Regions:
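N-terminal Rossmann-like dinucleotide-binding module
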Residues: 1-54
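Short glycine-/acidic-enriched loop or helix-start segments at secondary-structure transitions
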Residues: 16-17, 42, 65-66, 107-110
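Hydrophobic/aromatic ligand-binding patch that stacks against planar heteroaromatic rings
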Residues: 45, 112-113
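Beta-loop-alpha module in the N-terminal Rossmann-like domain of NAD(P)-dependent dehydrogenases
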Residues: 80-112
Length: 113
């Protein structure tokens, strides 16, 4: 079983990756998802894939997601910023990182992986 963190799960590459994961639940498990701005889609993805962690860009988005998650039974932890992206990219449980953040924004996290 491959344990995956997706850096940029709300973009086209991230969404395509999740489509493949959904087709092969016996081969893949989602450890973490992340986004920059699209917290509504990230929340929907969290409900569907139940990751251990989600990451967004800042404290405001983090609080918004934490508030939305209170109404669920999920134990997903919400992180934010560079430290959050680096954490999910380099966690020991992760076997595969999908670096789907465009440009230099995802460079440090990709190097951490």
């Amino acid at each position: 079983m491959k344990v995956i963190s997706i850096l940029g799960s709300t973009g086209s590459i991230g969404r395509s990756t999740l489509s493949v994961v959904e087709l092969h639940p016996d081969k893949f498990s989602i450890f973490a998802l992340s986004c920059f701005d699209n917290t509504d889609l990230l929340f929907k993805q969290t409900i569907k894939f139940k990751p251990s962690f989600i990451v967004t860009k800042d404290q405001f988005s983090k609080k918004r997601l934490k508030d939305k998650l209170k109404d669920t039974k999920l134990d997903t932890k919400v992180l934010c910023g560079k430290d959050g992206y680096n954490f999910i990219a380099s966690h020991d449980k992760v076997t595969t990182v999908v670096a789907a953040i465009t440009g230099s924004a995802g460079l440090i996290s990709t190097i951490e992986a």
